[in-house]
Amino acid sequence: MKKLLATAILGLASLSALAGSATVEYSNVEGVNGAKNGKGYLVNWNDSITKTLDGGFQMTTAQTDGTNSVSTRVEASLTPKYALGFGTAYIKGSVGLKLNSAGSTEFYAVEPGIIVPLGGGFSTRIGYRYRAAFDSGIADTTRTARVGLTYALTKKDALTLRYDQQRGNSEQNSVNFAYTRSF
């Protein structure tokens, strides 16, 4: 399973040179229910495979404040999109690898959501992400409700402000700031 997952991730990573867009993101993380605060960083490459299907690859790194604890995730995704009269529905499916000092863990994630244009260059995205380890004996299950607001600076540049509320084996709220460049 690890070899198959690594091959899929590396294959999508090699395609990232042909990406239609790239995103960089900073997250300010507030731990809840006794969890510590932290910071997060994300780099994402995304491209349209067809008019209704996107493929993506992303890397995230999270650091817990006051510790040397760092966790990195590498993730490949496919996102079918469905046009609605007022916006676009999507269901993002991902597989990935979590790396930290304890080793590595394979995981999957599913995120249904909706993107609604608001006019004046603004759009909003509302989604719900479920993530879990393939190995049910590993405590890496989270449920994240998210809402974001994007402003298109130009046809190729956008800024996003997003709020995530994550519960499960990791309990935190985060405010996320992202810049996306389309090519």
Question: Residues of each region from the PLM?
Answer:
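Outer-membrane beta-barrel proteins
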Residues: 2-183
